[in-house]
């Protein structure tokens, strides 16, 4: 039986003969032959191991080959629909760019640019000059620098200003920022020496003062943006540390994390320290992210006093951590939105989603509900009140009121429906709880409605 099956396996040339010539030209004859060999070898191995009792036909081998090569050509990084209500969803790419920022990236990608060319002088320029001015205008800082993420920013600052020196930081601020990436480890790589003061829940100004030695290089303050310590607590403000630092002639570095540029508490959100407030309190160097609350591209932005920023710019690590033209293009336009606060709220998707009026979200939910009326034979839809979150390790206490579309079905349970939606050609990421699938309308975009309808229709018709 085994020998007969092995003899029945089709030859590569025979299978190639039934392929469309256009398919062979599009994929490359060698690529098709290689895929066919793998498919036939897999079938042969399965026959020998008595795992199957059949030999593929020419047509079956051809079909498998076409499917395999089609999958190989698919993008690994693809568009997904965020139905979770987590605005800055770390796993789904964090912040979305505004239309104008997206266009700027496309222009930078499709044409030559003055990335490092001074158009006035007709000679080599600096990529950082393209964006330093707008950062200074918005924050009031004397100087600025952009690197590829905030962890890189804090490491570069510490290495530039505090190599082989002691850096004093509260134990309650020795945070982990995700992916097991911890402030003590970052400090270790920077070759600065960590000096912990206070306790996890209580640190006093005298703890900082008592830790000062001749080897002290800086005070470091880290905003605990992804958690809260409540109850019997005491922390020292940046303003208090800066007053002490001025007396002792010691620089102050602050990592404020999410990069809030405007006071969002006026829009009903949790109060977060802004970059401007940090600088106004007297902090010498501030670092923050570009792709969280700021709403731009992934970047680590360093602002502060010119004498310190200039020293950081001269560090050899700066070149290793520099950003590319796409990041600069996206960040420049995002920052220019902030020249007008109203424009920033309206045009930057992250800010717009976070500050959405509840009535508008309800209107979105009703619109989706009506769009799906034709699928009532497959599902039962209902609208419920719920809560969204900011995400991105920001505002852990903030719960944003929202409206959810609940999806129930008699023919498919919530676990399988969630999986089917997640594995759809344009994946739809949802919430599952209370025995149903939910879509949070806060994070649904204009182009998502049709995809959701088509996905649910195809799943229902299976």
Swiss-Prot record:
The keyword Protein biosynthesis applies. Pathway: Aminoacyl-tRNA biosynthesis; selenocysteinyl-tRNA(Sec) biosynthesis; selenocysteinyl-tRNA(Sec) from L-seryl-tRNA(Sec) (bacterial route): step 1/1. Its cofactor is pyridoxal 5'-phosphate. It catalyses: L-seryl-tRNA(Sec) + selenophosphate + H(+) = L-selenocysteinyl-tRNA(Sec) + phosphate. GO terms for cellular component: cytoplasm. Signal peptide: none annotated. GO terms for biological process: conversion of seryl-tRNAsec to selenocys-tRNAsec; selenocysteine incorporation. Its main location: cytoplasm. It comes from the Bacteria. Keywords: Cytoplasm, Protein biosynthesis, Pyridoxal phosphate, Selenium, Transferase. The modification N6-(pyridoxal phosphate)lysine is found at residue 292. Belongs to the SelA family. Converts seryl-tRNA(Sec) to selenocysteinyl-tRNA(Sec) required for selenoprotein biosynthesis. This is L-seryl-tRNA(Sec) selenium transferase. The gene is selA.
């Amino acid at each position: 039986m085994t020998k007969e099956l092995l003899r029945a396996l089709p030859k590569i040339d025979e299978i190639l003969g039934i392929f469309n010539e256009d398919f062979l030209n599009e994929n490359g004859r060698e690529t098709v032959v290689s895929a066919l060999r793998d498919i036939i070898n897999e079938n042969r191995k399965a026959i020998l191991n008595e795992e199957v009792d059949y030999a593929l036909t020419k047509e079956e081998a051809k079909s498998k080959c076409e499917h395999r090569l089609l999958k190989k050509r698919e993008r690994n990084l693809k568009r997904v629909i965020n139905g979770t209500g987590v605005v800055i969803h770390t796993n789904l790419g964090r912040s979305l760019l505004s239309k104008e920022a997206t266009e700027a990236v496309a222009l930078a990608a499709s044409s030559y640019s003055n990335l490092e060319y001074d158009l006035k002088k007709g000679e080599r320029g600096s990529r950082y000059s393209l964006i330093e001015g707008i950062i200074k205008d918005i924050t009031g800082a004397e100087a600025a620098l952009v690197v590829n993420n905030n962890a890189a920013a804090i490491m570069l600052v510490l290495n530039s200003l505090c190599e082989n020196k002691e850096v004093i930081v509260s134990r309650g601020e020795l945070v982990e920022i995700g992916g097991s990436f911890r402030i003590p480890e970052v400090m270790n790589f920077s070759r600065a020496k960590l000096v912990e003061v206070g306790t996890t829940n209580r640190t006093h100004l005298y703890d900082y003062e008592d830790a000062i030695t001749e080897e002290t290089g800086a005070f470091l303050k880290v905003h605990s943006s992804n958690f809260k310590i409540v109850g019997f607590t005491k922390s020292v403000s940046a303003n208090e540390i800066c007053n002490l630092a001025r007396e002792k002639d010691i620089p102050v570095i602050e990592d404020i994390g999410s990069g809030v540029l405007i006071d969002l508490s006026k829009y009903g959100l949790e109060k977060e320290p802004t970059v401007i407030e940090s600088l106004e309190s007297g902090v010498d160097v501030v670092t923050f992210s570009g792709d969280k609350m700021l709403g731009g591209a992934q970047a680590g932005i360093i602002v502060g006093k010119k004498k310190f920023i200039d020293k950081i710019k001269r560090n050899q690590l700066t070149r290793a951590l520099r950003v590319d033209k796409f990041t600069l293009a996206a960040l420049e336009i995002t920052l220019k939105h902030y020249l007008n606060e109203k424009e920033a709220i309206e045009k930057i998707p992250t800010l717009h989603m976070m500050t959405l009026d509840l009535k508008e979200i309800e209107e979105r939910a009703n619109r989706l509900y009506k769009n799906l009326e034709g699928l009532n034979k497959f599902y039962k839809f209902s609208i419920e009140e719920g809560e969204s979150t900011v995400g991105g390790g920001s505002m852990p206490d903030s719960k944003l009121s929202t409206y959810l579309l609940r999806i129930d079905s008699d023919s498919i349970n919530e676990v399988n429906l969630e999986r089917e939606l997640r594995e759809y050609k344009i994946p739809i990421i949802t919430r599952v709880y209370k025995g149903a699938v939910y879509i949070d309308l806060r994070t649904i975009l204009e182009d998502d409605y049709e995809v959701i309808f088509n996905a649910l229709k195809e799943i229902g018709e299976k």
